[in-house]
């Protein structure tokens, strides 16, 4: 199904993210296409600027779906990133969801992202690649950056940086003390003081674990009163997007000026910005 549509911008507070887009909003297209992953097939959702400057491999939260993240994906596209987001088997909108356990879905997620990375290499050769995720998708993206090496070599060599909105927390048996020490690329985690997940994260401070233990440079933004769905909060995203954009420009595209500006960035009143050097 090809649903190519023109995007007319982001309503409300989301429309002012990061002080304005690099590309006109009416030059951004959204559609979804078939994606073959091993012996099965899923959908690959694409949000594309007219003149791509890089590719963002995006992994959704557990049970979620790509279209739910329009605020973020459109903003990334406005900054020049083609966003490629597979519909994972654990999504409530995936037709075969019932046939996969949560444990099995993790491996399938990694396979999805590998297939998306192959599309990026084929369709956008030579462009820089980043990994972006929300919640369980943040873990997926961190794995593309080299995390959880004690389970398998998940590292995708093309990925230059990882951006995550919230994390799935310290999942017993999966997230060990060394989970993120094998990260081979810089990471930024955006979380909040109210970022809890029933049954998984009781203490919002658990989301700081990536920044505290990452093997490379790590940046953590903690938004005052931000919850687990912070990624869909237009007002909060507008407030924090300048740092996000600087991080992606600095480490995704190798912009030295952006790196210097990120170093000097100050969080708005009530928020926190924590930097861990490599």
Task: Please place each PLM-identified region on the residue numbering.
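C-terminal segment of N-terminal export signals and the immediately downstream linker at the start
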Residues: 1, 21-34
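Serine-hydrolase catalytic machinery in alpha/beta-hydrolase-like enzymes
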Residues: 32-48, 52-126
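Primarily recognizes the serine-hydrolase "nucleophile elbow" in alpha/beta-hydrolase
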Residues: 118-178
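Alpha/beta-hydrolase-fold serine-hydrolase catalytic core, especially in secreted/extracellular enzymes
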Residues: 225, 234-278
């Amino acid at each position: 199904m090809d649903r190519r549509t023109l995007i007319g911008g982001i309503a409300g507070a989301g429309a002012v993210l990061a002080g304005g887009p690099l590309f006109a909003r009416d030059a951004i297209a959204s559609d979804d296409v078939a994606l073959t992953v091993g012996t099965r097939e899923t959908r690959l959702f694409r949000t594309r600027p007219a003149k791509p400057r890089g590719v963002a491999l995006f992994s959704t939260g557990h049970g979620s779906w790509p279209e739910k993240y329009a605020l973020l994906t459109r903003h990334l596209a406005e900054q020049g990133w083609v966003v490629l987001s597979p519909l994972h088997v654990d999504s409530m909108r995936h037709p075969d969801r019932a046939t996969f356990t949560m444990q099995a879905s993790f491996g399938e997620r990694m396979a999805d992202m590998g297939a998306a990375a192959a599309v990026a290499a084929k369709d956008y050769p030579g462009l820089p690649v980043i990994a972006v995720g929300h919640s369980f998708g943040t873990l997926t993206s961190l794995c593309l950056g080299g995390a959880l090496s004690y389970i398998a070599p998940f590292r995708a060599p093309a990925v230059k940086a990882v951006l995550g909105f919230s994390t799935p927390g310290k999942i017993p048996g999966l997230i060990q003390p060394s989970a993120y020490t094998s990260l081979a690329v810089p990471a930024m985690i955006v979380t909040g003081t109210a970022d809890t997940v029933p049954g998984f994260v009781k203490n919002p401070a658990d989301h700081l674990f990536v920044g505290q233990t990452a093997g490379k440079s790590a940046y953590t933004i903690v938004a005052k009163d931000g919850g687990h769905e912070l990624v869909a909060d237009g007002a909060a995203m507008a407030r924090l997007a300048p740092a996000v954009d600087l991080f992606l420009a600095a480490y995704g595209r190798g912009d030295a000026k952006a790196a210097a500006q990120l170093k000097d960035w100050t969080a708005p009143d009530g928020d926190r910005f924590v930097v861990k050097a490599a």
